[in-house]
A protein has these predicted regions:
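N-terminal glycine/serine-rich phosphate-binding loop of ATP-dependent small-molecule kinases
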Residues: 1-108, 234-243
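Gly/Ser/Thr-rich active-site cleft segment
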Residues: 12-14, 136, 140-257
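Short loop segments at secondary-structure junctions
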Residues: 25, 100-101, 125, 169-171
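A short acidic, often aromatic-flanked loop/helix-cap motif at beta-alpha or helix-coil junctions
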Residues: 40-41, 128-129, 250-252
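Generic structural "secondary-structure junction" signal
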Residues: 42, 100, 123, 213-215, ...
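Active-site phosphate-binding/coordination module
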Residues: 44, 77-160
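Short, well-ordered alpha-helical packing segments
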Residues: 61, 65-72, 120, 131-135, ...
């Protein structure tokens, strides 16, 4: 029916994306599609013996296009014209360094084959040392415990540890990076045409649990706290974000295509 409305959900897992088309009024599943990340499937950009797991942003884009097209092809005629929303969930923390436009560095020719310019997958454990330093800083006597709302222990799987590890390891990425984006925030920014890193809407769930964001201390930890971990983090707080939004808030509008 022409007045039937639909939404599309995309679940980005470790190996693949699942697209789901749902009828808004009834919650009925109309069609699904699963597509595997092509580069990841080949084992590219990862070093298992080092617990180094990276994913290319092109993998995310290509499976987005393929899964949505296939799912819609399985729906009744006219469904695509009546899609009124899309939503994403992803594994985390899976951050990537971006330029001022919010583009992951791996999308640039000079970084296309550099794993440090790609998304650092949730299960990447290369930042064990950095996580230990964060825990030590947060738990020393008299310090504000910025891990208090994250279970009291900061993990090497999380945002700040991974960011600091890459900054220390890769001068080229360090020099080219303007900001950092979480996978769950980049996908909505991508499909809504966001062209500025500062305009990317940040999800409260990932920010609160992985990035030590909390209203109690005004958002992210203060710059002086970050810089005390390593001067390489100087300036990052202002280039990241202050506010976050909950999952019930729209971040933009769908383009016609």
């Amino acid at each position: 029916m022409a007045d039937t409305k639909y939404v599309i959900g995309l679940d980005y897992g470790s190996d693949s994306v699942r697209a789901l088309v749902v009828e808004v009024a009834t919650g009925k599943t109309v069609a699904t599609s699963v597509k595997y990340y092509p580069r990841w499937k080949k084992g590219l950009y990862c070093t298992p013996l080092e617990n180094k797991w990276r994913q290319h942003p092109l993998d995310y884009i290509e499976v987005l296009e393929a899964s949505v097209k296939e799912a819609l092809s399985l729906c009744p005629e006219g469904t695509a014209e009546n899609v009124i929303g899309m939503s994403f969930d992803t594994t985390g923390s899976t951050p990537a360094f971006v330029d001022e436009t919010g583009t992951p560095l791996a999308m640039k020719p000079e970084f296309a084959e550099n794993p440090n310019a790609m998304f650092v997958l949730w299960k990447d454990h290369t930042a064990v040392k950095e996580a230990a330093e964060i825990n030590e800083a947060c738990h020393k006597e008299g310090a504000v415990d910025y891990t208090a709302y994250e279970g009291g222990i900061y993990s090497s799987e999380w945002w700040w540890a991974k960011i600091l590890h890459v900054l220390r390891e890769d001068e080229a990425v360090r020099d080219a990076a303007y900001s950092v984006v979480e996978h769950c925030d980049w996908m909505p920014a991508l499909i809504t045409g966001c062209k500025s890193a500062k305009d990317i809407v940040r999800a409260r769930c990932s920010a609160g649990h992985k990035m030590m964001w909390h209203e109690k201390w005004g958002g992210l930890p203060p710059q002086e706290v970050l810089s005390s971990l390593d001067p390489l983090l100087d300036g990052y707080r202002d280039r990241l974000f202050t506010d976050t939004e909950t999952a019930d808030k729209a971040v933009g509008t769908l383009p016609q295509e």
